[in-house]
């Protein structure tokens, strides 16, 4: 059975996250990407699932609703400035996960950050992409709607191909926002789908390890040992039940 993992930096890199512990027992492809939002995560896992005919299970970790991704090619006003670095974690190409995205002719910018006001790994990305969006376009309701639509998109894809899927959030996310009528309806649809939902990674680690809430609030990640405990006690048993 093939396991396809998706997510942000809470999933990226088998050596540092829960995905590595799962990979010890299963054939796993890790599509996790640093700074990824839920739009990028959805695209990446659908792209990878589409390469396999059968016998796959999706384990997808969802990220912050404030995060977005933007398509970049040589025609983009900021292209020359953006490609000046080497392998920045805010750039991604889910079709070539083992190559430097900014060396490709086209790639994606991932805004990252712990919330809409706190920069991620790059002040440049925050100033060019996040600040203008936050000033003129951002709303919690629209971000909820778009994230839930991305989750539904993955769920519908899995349903159409009868792919079993497991999902969880990076930490408490939806609980931080008040849903309005648009997002409430979508959330009800999400819960109706044939998905195994797990407790979010951050909350589980706070309840079962020495991770503190303030660490998560400050943008820190669970340690490798905490990730491994979550994998052994939560993710792997859930996978076993589906096999």
Enumerate the predicted regions with their spans.
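Alpha-helical cap/lid subdomain in secreted, periplasmic
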Residues: 46-243
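Serine-esterase "nucleophile elbow" of acetyl-processing enzymes
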Residues: 1-52, 223, 228-229
